[in-house]
Amino acid sequence: MKASIVAKLEVLVERYEEVQALLGDPGTISDQNKYRELTKEYAQLEVVVLSFKKYQSAQNDLAVAEMMSDDDDPDMREMAKEEIKEAKKTVEKLAADLQILLLPKDPNDDRNCYLEIRAGAGGDEAAIFAGNLFRMYSKYAESKGWRVEVMNSNASEQGGYKELIAKIDGEGAYGIMKFESGGHRVQRVPETESQGRIHTSACTVVVMPEVPEAEAISINPADLKVDTFRASGAGGQHVNKTDSAVRLTHLPTGTVVECQDQRSQHKNRAQAMSVLQSRLQQAEDEKSHAEEQTIRRSLVASGDRSERIRTYNYPQGRVSDHRINLTVYRLNEVLEGDLNALHEPILLEDQADKLAALSQAEF
């Protein structure tokens, strides 16, 4: 392991001991917010520090075994040879584990997220596909124990959605779902196609982390245009007699958010404001990370329509992820919410990218 990485670990050990002392300080205990933050930091550091101590212990075992290899007794030398072999394996494994623990973590990964699905090229068929995607994500969320709440939807007459915004509540939701951002393409024969021709349609998916109220971007009321209107449910299931739906327009950026799935204007406005703040925060983050993205390719797409990440081919029963050249012939399972076959390889690829960057970094 690089000396610079070992030095980084030694700094973390010092910080771990410092936090440990602070947690026993009466002044810290009396400040609940500070105590909560330090407790969280301590738990994160403890995993790394304990792993580093195991690594140091394994290094010592290896050094002792190497000393034994110079012994005059041939039996001792043979035993040392076996111990060196095992100790090297242990050291390599622990070094690899430590490097993974040191990978930079996205502070948003543990947060809830907003899911936006928009039908693109393909007309009614694209809207139907948007409905398929939302059903897929809903089933996946259910399997993870997450809760999905539709915040705004624009249903298509032929089925599916022209546009849909939902919130996904659950631990680690954004950390996994963020890899779904980008262009999704479907190739299949529409039910209305009499000639049996395969059509290609597309949808855009955008996943944004929910921004906690304390960290939310401050929006000047003068920069906000608020419109209210009457809302109707999917397929016209209900029509409110009051103007409960809310449309917010952020004038400086032209960002527009609508929410109408709650019966109360107050709730719709609160939800719309939360989505707007998340969109503005994401735009700010993308801008600040632009330079980094040119240096290291990112598997998390920006949600640009032209950035196609996945194709769902019905005739062949396959799903292809174009970011990592992965194809799985499990279309039905994927559409039923089994996304593990797609998520696990891309998470590993993202981890490999970060490890490569770590190995080149100087601390």
Curated annotation (Swiss-Prot):
Major subcellular location class: cytoplasm
Modification N5-methylglutamine occurs at: Q237
Location in the cell: Cytoplasm
InterPro entries documented for this protein: PCRF, Pep_chain_release_fac_I, Pep_chain_release_fac_I_sf, Prokaryotic/Mito_RF, RF-1
Sequence segments annotated as region (Disordered): 281-302
Organism, as annotated: Psychromonas ingrahamii (strain DSM 17664 / CCUG 51855 / 37)
A GO cellular component entry from the record: cytoplasm
PROSITE patterns: RF_PROK_I
Top-rank taxon: Bacteria
GO molecular function annotations of the record: translation release factor activity, codon specific
Segments traversing the membrane: none
Protein's name according to its UniProt entry: Peptide chain release factor 1
Pfam families associated with the record: PCRF (PF03462), RF-1 (PF00472)
Bias (Basic and acidic residues) ranges: 282-295
Post-translational modification summary for this protein: Methylated by PrmC. Methylation increases the termination efficiency of RF1.
Keywords from the UniProt entry: Cytoplasm, Methylation, Protein biosynthesis
Family named by the database record: Belongs to the prokaryotic/mitochondrial release factor family.
UniProt entry tagged with the keyword Cytoplasm: yes
Function per UniProt: Peptide chain release factor 1 directs the termination of translation in response to the peptide chain termination codons UAG and UAA.
